[in-house]
From Swiss-Prot:
GO CC terms of this entry: cytosolic large ribosomal subunit
Complex and partners: Part of the 50S ribosomal subunit.
Family: Belongs to the universal ribosomal protein uL30 family.
Domain of life: Bacteria
Name assigned to this protein: Large ribosomal subunit protein uL30
One GO term (biological process): translation
Alphabetical keyword list: Ribonucleoprotein, Ribosomal protein
CDD domains: Ribosomal_L30
HAMAP family: Ribosomal_uL30_B (MF_01371_B)
Claim: Ribosomal protein is one of the keywords in the record: yes
Length: 62
């Protein structure tokens, strides 16, 4: 069984007053509110999304 590497991403700051592109990126990551944690596949596209909103999220677990 080929298991993809997963990472956990947690939203640490609010999206209120942020750039619309950054709000859309949070939505694309599946994050809705402060403290929300999602487990996502570790791909270059997901890493790029995390880098775009680095000031609002943290990688909890790799």
């Amino acid at each position: 069984m080929n298991m993809a590497k997963m990472i956990k991403v947690k939203q640490t700051k609010s999206a209120i007053g942020r750039l619309p592109k950054h709000k859309a990126t949070l939505t694309g990551l599946g994050l809705r509110r402060i403290g929300h944690v999602r487990e996502l596949e570790d791909t270059p596209s997901v890493r790029g999304m995390i880098n775009r909103v680095f000031y609002m999220v943290e990688v909890v677990e790799e």
